[in-house]
């Protein structure tokens, strides 16, 4: 399992987490170009990404979603409240139908060889969540959590 922050802070957030077979992003709060550059440093590109999990709708977590959804068609997972919030951000432009996958806190999602578990957090947003990423492998279970913007 590999975890790599591409950006973190009030100017934008994006974290890569992956295994040999499965590659996901948590948030896309920077430009598509910056995400691609960050992935390139790890020998990856947006073509390798299987899914994007969004913690909440604030622009420092969603800035790249519009362009990525139109150019790359990567499935985006988040809660209903977060998706509704994202759809209200006009600067993201048109997001294609079928890109969003609604999830519920405390209900696991399987992507490739991993399980992603969303859980509720406290933040001033619509239905914000954090995520635990779990991989079962020959040498046991590996876990990592992505928790941003608490309070």
Where are the model-predicted features located?
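Beta-strand->loop->alpha-helix junctions that form or flank phosphate-binding loops
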Residues: 7, 51, 100-104
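Active-site metal-binding motif and surrounding structural segment of the metallo-beta-lactamase
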Residues: 32-78
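Metallo-beta-lactamase
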Residues: 80-141
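A generic "binding-loop/recognition-motif" signal
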Residues: 11, 31, 58, 82, ...
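Structured catalytic core of nucleotide-sugar glycosyltransferases
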Residues: 4-14, 56-61, 116-118
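Conserved beta-strand hairpin/beta-sheet module of binuclear metal-dependent hydrolase folds
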Residues: 1-42, 128-149
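Short secondary-structure boundary/capping segments
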Residues: 7, 16, 43, 66, ...
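Conserved Rossmann-like nucleotide-binding pocket used by diverse enzymes
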Residues: 53, 117, 146
């Amino acid at each position: 399992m590999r975890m790599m922050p591409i950006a973190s802070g009030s100017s934008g957030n994006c974290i890569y987490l992956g295994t040999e077979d499965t590659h996901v992003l948590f948030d896309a709060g920077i430009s598509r170009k910056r995400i691609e550059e960050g992935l390139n440093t790890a020998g990856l590109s947006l073509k390798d990404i299987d899914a994007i999990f969004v913690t909440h709708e604030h622009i420092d977590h969603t800035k790249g979603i519009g362009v990525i959804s139109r150019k790359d068609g990567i499935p985006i997972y988040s809660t209903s409240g977060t998706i509704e919030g994202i759809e209200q951000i006009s600067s993201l432009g048109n997001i294609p139908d079928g890109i969003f996958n609604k999830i519920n806190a405390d209900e696991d999602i399987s992507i490739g060889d991993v399980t992603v578990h969303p859980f509720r957090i406290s933040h001033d947003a619509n239905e914000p969540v954090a995520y635990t990423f779990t991989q079962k492998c020959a040498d046991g279970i590996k876990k990592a959590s992505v928790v941003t913007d608490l309070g």
